From Swiss-Prot:
Pfam families: Abhydrolase_1 (PF00561). Belongs to the peptidase S33 family. Keywords: Hydrolase. This is L-amino acid amidase. PANTHER family: HYDROLASE, PUTATIVE (AFU_ORTHOLOGUE AFUA_2G14860)-RELATED, MONOACYLGLYCEROL LIPASE. Residues 33-284 form the AB hydrolase-1 domain. Its EC number is 3.5.1.101. One of its GO terms (cellular component) is membrane. The keyword Ribonucleoprotein does not apply. Completely inhibited by ZnSO(4), ZnCl(2), AgNO(3), CdCl(2) and HgCl(2). Partially inhibited by PbCl(2), NiCl(2) and CoCl(2). Unaffected by LiBr, H(2)BO(3), NaCl, MgSO(4), AlCl(3), KCl, CaCl(2), CrCl(3), MnCl(2), FeSO(4), Fe(NH(4))(2)(SO(4))(2), CuSO(4), RbCl, Na(2)MoO(4), (NH(4))(6)Mo(7)O(24), SnCl(2), CsCl and BaCl(2). Completely inhibited by phenylhydrazine, but not by the other carbonyl reagents hydroxylamine, hydrazine, D,L-penicillamine and D-cycloserine. Unaffected by the chelating agents o-phenanthroline, 8-hydroxyquinoline, enthylenediaminetetraacetic acid and alpha,alpha'-dipyridyl.
Length: 310
């Protein structure tokens, strides 16, 4: 039976700005909705669009474009200091309030989205029911050191080409871009050619890299922005909701990168997708969605109004 999606889009006012969002499914279904936080920082919802499949289970799915990206307000003239973790935490809380789901929701954060989701979950918000960090760092220094290790395993000459242009600051040189793409094809998305929604996200980052450059850097693995010293290690034990860690066998988020989630969070489980890198939701879409739905059904199975009554 084909699932006919109920979809609505809108904008949440965030101060003087607008946050675009999309709801797939019914927020009044009684089942905990899932908020999907995209990566970057500076990407868009497009490449994580596949998580809309979860709505067929009865859990409504909310996608949104973070400020500065996609269909939300762009601010290319803002100083890099404007773009902070705190800003994006405020935007997330504002969206939860706008959708009137702040008393009952789950979060799935992919890559940077899982970093932001971790910061949110560490604060123990009363309505958070479950947390899914997908392919996410816990320490940017570990992330970079693991990326450097993976780079050295790429075909001969790729790592050396990357080093040469990073030293020179020539990040737009076609040679650097081609070498970067080799890393991406091994450790970011192994589907060839890239699905249209993945290519669309990268095209939008290229069109306005304001947030990506300010907080991360020119590539996934050369982190020189404001997040370069970020870490959640030592704070993750504050996360007090059931947690599902997702990663891929070929992921730039290596087992060493995600290990602190498993070490520090009390109620945690790990799904490792053998044929995926950084995007199991694209590379093993059906299996990934099934894993997410099974987890949500297990940990959010009791209707929220029953919990409240108890």
């Amino acid at each position: 039976m084909e699932f006919i999606e109920k979809i609505r889009e809108g904008y949440a006012a965030f101060g003087a700005y607008q946050t675009w969002y999309r709801v797939t499914g019914d927020l009044s279904s009684g089942r905990t909705p899932l908020v999907v936080i995209h990566g970057g920082p500076g990407c868009t919802h497009d490449y994580v669009d596949a998580f809309k499949d979860v709505a067929a289970s009865g859990h409504a799915v909310i996608h949104y474009d973070q400020l500065g990206n996609g269909r939300s307000t762009h601010l290319p003239d803002k100083d890099p200091s404007f773009w902070t973790v705190g800003l994006f935490l405020e935007e997330l809380n504002n969206l939860l309030d706008h959708l009137q789901i702040s008393d009952n929701y789950a979060i799935l954060g992919q890559s940077w989205g899982g970093m932001l989701g971790s910061e949110h979950a560490i604060l123990q918000p009363k309505g958070l029911r479950a947390f899914i960090p997908a392919n996410s760092p816990t320490c940017m220094r570990t992330w970079v050191s693991e990326a450097n290790r993976l780079r050295k395993l790429l075909p001969e000459g790729v790592h050396e080409t990357l080093l040469k242009h990073e030293a020179a600051g020539t990040y737009q040189d076609p040679e650097y871009l081609a070498a970067s793409r080799v890393f991406y094809d091994h450790h970011v998305c192994r589907v060839n050619p890239w699905p249209e929604e993945v290519a669309r996200t990268f095209a939008q980052v290229d069109a306005d890299p304001t947030v990506y450059h300010a907080m991360s850097g020119p590539t996934e693995f050369h982190v020189i922005g404001s997040l370069k010293d970020w870490k959640s290690i030592g704070r993750l034990s504050a996360i007090n909701v059931p947690t599902l860690v997702i990663s891929g066998r070929h992921d730039e988020a290596t087992p060493l990168v995600v290990k602190p989630f498993l070490d520090e969070i009390a109620d945690v489980r790990w799904a490792l997708f053998e044929d995926s890198s950084h995007m199991p939701h694209v590379e093993e879409r059906q299996a990934c969605m099934g894993t997410v739905v099974k987890f949500l059904d297990e940990v959010c199975s009791v209707p929220h109004n029953v919990l409240k009554a108890g």
